[in-house]
Amino acid sequence: MRAVRCHRFAANSGSSKQISPIREVLCLEDLPLPTLHAEENDKNKVLISTHYAGIQYPDFLQAQGLYQIKPNLPYIPGMDVAGIVIDKGSDVNELSIGEQVYANTALCPDGGGGTGGLAEVVSVSANAVFPIPNNLHLSSVANIGRNYCAAYHSLKVIGNVGPNDLVLVTGASGGVGMATVELAKAMGAKVIAGVSTLNKGSLPLTAGADKVLAYGRDRKVHKQFKLDVKAACKELGHPQGASLIVDVIHGDLFQDALVSSIQPLGKICLVGFVAGQKPIKPGLLLIKEASIVGSLWGRWARENPVEFRNNMNEIFGYMKEGKIKPRADTIFSLDNYIKAFELFENNSGKGNTVISMNASQHSKL
């Protein structure tokens, strides 16, 4: 089978100052086809023929060696898999061969850093596999884990968001940001979507955002963004600020605009730090009695499998009802996988990026 592999990290010794081009560290290889045996370890496993694999910014960061979780080298990137069950262990009763499914490699017992998805055939634990409703196309669910699971965990498990809440989302034109906007609206909340530039504003508007505001890339624009958020909060009936902030950007924006935008006793949920890590000043947070909470859903999901499966069922329920509409915004063939990673290298990724794994069934781009 063919699979994408990373043999070394792009960042030298984890330094963001010396980074090789991403195409120098990833390669498409022929690897042995995984199989299931009668051994105890394989009784609860499933083999999936991968039709689509999701790629998002964390996958790019991971290949650079700059993500929170570093896999052992060499490794196959990709956490999200959508495909067809082609074999299963003797203890797997809830799935059928030929069934279309979504699988999340981060749910396997060792977690694996959420890797292994960019392969034509994937072997995963049955607890990491979820049947896909028949009305959903495989390509549309190939980013559920990186995007919708991260968003749901931030909104519901951490934020307990409901109909009376106001959510501020940064990076709202990206995969996690778009999913956060959609899910927050499905939960009945109002949403302010923050984007780097207004030319990225159409996607969160389509997802249902009540307001779209630009925070730019410099501190002058950050200050204007803070004023714009304050005005938007008042307009949306929350003069004291947002109930929850879901932040994937961090950097200077966090201190310049986000801390002042949270309501007293509110929560700021840190999902990522695309703009880098900056010191946090505690003064205003103390006065507001506001909380900063990290959001990394994989460990929680492995430790709370029943609750997580219920959460997944709720996400799929929103999909069936049309309250959220997962989609593949950009699709590349496996032969052109590097272009997907270069979208994030060039800071031009928008929405959901997907690799079509089966060249015989899916046209190349």
Give the positions of each predicted feature.
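Glycine-rich beta-strand-centered segment in the early N-terminal region that forms part
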Residues: 32-55, 66-108, 115-116
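C-terminal capping/lid region of NAD(P)-dependent oxidoreductase domains
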Residues: 1, 316, 323-330, 338-365
